[in-house]
């Protein structure tokens, strides 16, 4: 009997079926396989770095834990975004924008439109996102709109018109915390006469010098003229500009000798350590003091305690005004824009703001967020201050100016403080107002919506 056996017919058929299945599977994988999942990583451009980093670090860690998306923070240090804004504009002009970036609500965003090849069409309209998370139901969300559209989702509310005072320095020299401009000038000159730096502002990162002039101007001119300055519709010969400049120079004369070399964190440090009496800044300084100087107790001017070291107050003459600085997120269009939108959505949500604002020194834009989440008495006080404020304006130094106008005034204010060249400053202000109005008119935008323009003011070009 032969040892060879023939292969049975069922086996042949079965093998053929298997072969066909394998071929079909290979063809399916080659031509019909599911698309590769997009990379779970985005870049977020920001100027929060160094001593101001804890808040954004906490937010990013929270977002990554929730979504699995890695966020690379490309930080360009410099207070108020002095350097970051122009780095972002350069990326946009080169056609390589990040997936998301930090921006202030207001005309600052329009500067990015103007720098982009297709203007606002290169950015994601976030109006629907704002509706979904409820931020457009808030007062802050509404005023962040540009002619009824939201391109920046707000993540917090800062107050710019604050003065920080070292209680020990004032007590040792028999000075009561000043509540009026006249009292501030008298106190500053008295301290200067004793060889004590009174007003400690910083020249290295430019912004706190213009910031001081701005608060003086707000106190002298009032909120309506301040808003007209923002739109460039204020007469450059208005007497309030000259009066604010005169007061500014009186206070600038009491700066420490090395003020041009200081940045804003160093200026805060001087006042905290008693090497100066006053520093005018926003409540991001509250976050800095809270995260860096653990043993330093802050208190509002209305409830000074014996153990208080730093008194925080509205800048004299601006008590009823909340000078807003609103940090926000913008999203350029691109292959990963959906991830950028998701990041902006989380950051601007109640959940994101509860993570970010406590260490930042700011407060949430949502009025129903309980004040007890804030670690400092100043933030709890600011919640009430905002609720009670009669007027709201947008800070000129922090978002209410187009970038080119902002740069003119930043450098002009430092030159004014150094050389007291008032004619040059008035010329700079005149040019700045003219350019500010021209850029607003060129774009046709205004803050708010047709139904609710910011502060009830519709500029002449409003469509």
Where in this protein do the model-derived segments appear?
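Extracytoplasmic/periplasmic substrate-recognition and gating elements
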Residues: 61, 66, 94, 172-173, ...
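Extracytoplasmic/periplasmic solute-binding protein
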Residues: 146-155, 161, 185-232, 276
């Amino acid at each position: 009997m032969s040892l060879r056996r023939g292969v049975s017919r069922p086996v042949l058929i079965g093998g053929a079926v298997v072969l066909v299945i394998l071929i079909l599977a290979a063809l399916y994988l080659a031509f019909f396989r599911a698309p590769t999942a997009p990379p779970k990583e985005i870049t977020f451009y920001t100027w929060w770095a160094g001593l101001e980093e804890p808040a954004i670090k906490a937010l990013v860690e929270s977002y990554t834990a929730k979504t699995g998306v890695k966020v690379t923070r490309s930080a360009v240090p410099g207070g108020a975004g002095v350097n970051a804004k122009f780095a972002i504009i350069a990326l946009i002009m080169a056609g390589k924008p990040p997936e998301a970036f930090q921006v202030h609500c207001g005309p600052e965003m329009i500067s990015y439109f103007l720098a982009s090849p297709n203007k606002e069409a290169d950015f994601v309209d976030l109006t629907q996102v704002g509706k979904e998370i409820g931020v457009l139901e808030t007062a802050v969300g509404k005023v962040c709109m540009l002619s009824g559209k939201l391109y920046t989702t707000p993540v917090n509310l800062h107050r710019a018109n604050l003065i920080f005072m070292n209680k020990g320095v004032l007590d040792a020299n028999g000075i009561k915390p000043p509540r009026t401009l006249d009292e501030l000038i008298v106190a500053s000159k008295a301290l200067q006469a004793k060889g004590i730096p009174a007003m400690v502002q910083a020249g290295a990162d430019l912004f706190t010098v213009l910031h001081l002039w701005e608060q003086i101007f707000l106190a002298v001119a009032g909120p309506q003229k301040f808003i007209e300055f923002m739109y460039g519709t204020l007469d450059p010969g208005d007497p309030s500009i000259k009066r604010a400049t005169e007061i500014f120079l009186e206070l600038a004369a009491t700066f420490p000798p090395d003020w041009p070399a200081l940045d804003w964190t160093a200026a805060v440090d001087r006042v905290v350590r008693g090497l100066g009496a006053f520093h005018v800044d926003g409540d991001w300084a509250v976050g800095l003091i809270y995260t860096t100087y653990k043993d330093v107790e802050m208190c509002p001017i209305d409830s000074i305690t014996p153990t208080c070291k730093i008194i925080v107050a509205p800048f004299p003459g601006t008590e009823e005004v909340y000078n807003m600085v609103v940090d926000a997120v913008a999203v350029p269009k691109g292959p990963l824009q959906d991830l950028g939108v998701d990041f902006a959505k989380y950051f601007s949500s109640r959940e994101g703001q509860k993570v970010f604002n406590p260490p930042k020194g700011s407060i949430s834009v949502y009025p129903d967020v309980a004040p007890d989440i804030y670690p400092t008495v100043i933030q709890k006080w600011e919640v009430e201050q905002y609720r009670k404020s009669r007027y709201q304006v947008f800070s000129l130094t922090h978002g209410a100016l187009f970038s080119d106008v902002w740069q003119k005034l930043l450098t002009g204010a430092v030159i004014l403080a150094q050389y007291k060249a008032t004619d040059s400053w008035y010329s700079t202000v005149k040019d700045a107002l003219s350019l500010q109005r021209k850029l607003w008119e060129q774009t046709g935008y205004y803050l708010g919506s047709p139904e609710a323009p910011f502060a009830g003011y519709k500029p002449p070009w409003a469509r």
